[in-house]
Amino acid sequence: EENLLCSTEDRYEGEDIFVRTFALTIRRFALDAVDEGTSAAINRAYARAIAAGLWENTLAEINDDEYWMEGVQSYFDANREDTDEDRGPNSSHNAVNTRDELAEYDPALWAIAESVFGDTPWRPEC
């Protein structure tokens, strides 16, 4: 609630939990039901990314849903950034928190997000 209302007491400051949750909702209730090919592409991209050592010690490493949610947050410039110097061994995030950084770091995930959401200029307000 604090995150959605842009409260100063938001424990998720720097990221948008609505975008994150919406990403999972789209996957489970739209892509899985109507566009299984895209959902399968997420699974393949996740497996390749993890095999390549991407997303180490982040939420995106946990499973393909977390991977998708973290990617969508970054696609909408709505993810928290933890630089390598700031990150602990089990950090939730890394330095990827914008659309451009996602395109460079994980082009496969960026391409899937772009195919689902298009090149929209929309970004969350807080």
Model region roles, listed by residue range:
Residues 9-17, 59-63, 100-107:
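Soluble non-cytosolic domains of exported or imported proteins
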Residues 1-5, 45-54, 89-93:
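Short, conserved helix/loop micro-motifs enriched in His/Cys and acidic residues
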Residues 11, 20, 27-28, 44, ...:
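Arginine residue identity/basic-tract feature
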Residues 29-81:
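Post-HExxH zinc-binding segment in Zn-dependent metallohydrolases
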Residues 72-126:
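Pan-zinc metallopeptidase signature
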Residues 1-43:
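Acidic/His-rich structured neighborhood in mature extracellular/periplasmic domains
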